[in-house]
Design a protein with these regions (language model features):
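N-terminal edge beta-strand
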Residues: 43-70, 162-180
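Aromatic sugar-binding surface patches on proteins
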Residues: 108-116, 232-241
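Short acidic/polar inter-strand loop motif in beta-rich domains
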Residues: 135-141, 257-266
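Short beta-strand edge segments in extracellular beta-sheet folds
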Residues: 145-151, 269-272
């Protein structure tokens, strides 16, 4: 009986100590864990700057994605796009990715609207922050959270030699009829493996080296429409949908640069 009482007392003491230890620890919810990377990113990229919460920065993404490798993602910003007042850049962060900085899109008044639709990668459930910078220096931010996983690592897809040979091929099309002096929408499909450097190559049992598009430039009749600095967070075979203003028929041209020195060009006559 005495031994049983001693065991009971020890259990009570251990339980009490455990409860006290838990009470002494700061609460760490899932939401707080997801927010932690963004706090660090703000210090790295926007130290000393004010980011204004902006509901007019619209983000479209699924709450849950079937695959983290190809997650549809779009933003559209309700803001003037005139020579005096426009959104000059939009930065996309996937906070939980190995490389959170996914892309920086640079816009001009000829973009017509600061918007983009594409596909991005998620290594794990993560908030996505979209930061828009106006030409007056003001910064606007909005966010969504997406549940997805496995988009950056895993096994490298397909035949590496075939993927390298096809890299840089492009197709462009206009969404709908040409509208003179109005916002037109273009669709650009790029063949490129967009290797992250974190994918296992089954043939070598090592990691397939990173190989990705790092710069995209779009012009209309030789004038800048938009450009993008991209990284491994953009999905394989990138798809980009964007707008541009065209006052008269001309050529829409795209130039790509990848991290291995490759340069690729594609043009499309519009309105002819």
């Amino acid at each position: 009986m005495k031994n049983r009482c001693q065991v009971t007392r020890r259990r009570l003491v251990f339980s009490t100590l455990a409860m006290l230890a838990c009470a002494a620890c700061p609460p760490w919810t899932t939401a707080q864990a997801l927010d932690a990377p963004w706090t660090a990113l703000q210090k790295s990229y926007y130290a000393g700057k004010k980011l204004e919460a902006a509901p007019f920065v619209h983000i479209t993404a699924p709450a849950r994605a079937a695959s983290g490798e190809q997650v549809p993602f779009a933003f559209s910003i309700d803001h003037p796009m005139t020579a005096k007042q426009y959104i000059k850049s939009v930065t996309v962060f996937v906070d939980g990715n190995p490389v959170p900085l996914t892309a920086v899109f640079h816009f001009t008044p000829q973009s017509g609207k600061a918007e983009m639709a594409t596909r991005i990668r998620f290594e794990s459930d993560s908030p996505v922050h979209v930061v828009a910078e106006a030409n007056d220096g003001r910064l606007y931010v909005n966010e969504v959270t997406v549940r997805a996983s496995g988009g950056c690592g895993g096994t490298a897809p397909g035949d590496d030699a075939a993927a390298m040979a096809a890299a840089g091929k492009m197709k462009m099309a206009l969404d709908g009829p040409f509208k003179r002096g109005e916002l037109n929408k273009a669709r650009l499909l790029i063949r490129h493996p967009m290797y992250t450097g974190l994918q296992r190559d089954l043939a070598t049992n090592g990691f397939r080296p990173a190989f990705f598009i790092e710069k995209i430039a779009v012009t209309y009749k030789g004038k800048p429409v938009l450009s993008a600095d991209t990284s491994i967070g953009i999905s394989e075979n990138p798809l980009l949908q964007f707008g541009f203003i065209a006052d008269e028929p001309g050529a829409l041209e795209v130039v790509l640069h990848d991290n291995k020195g490759g340069t690729f060009r594609q043009s499309m006559d519009v309105g002819g």
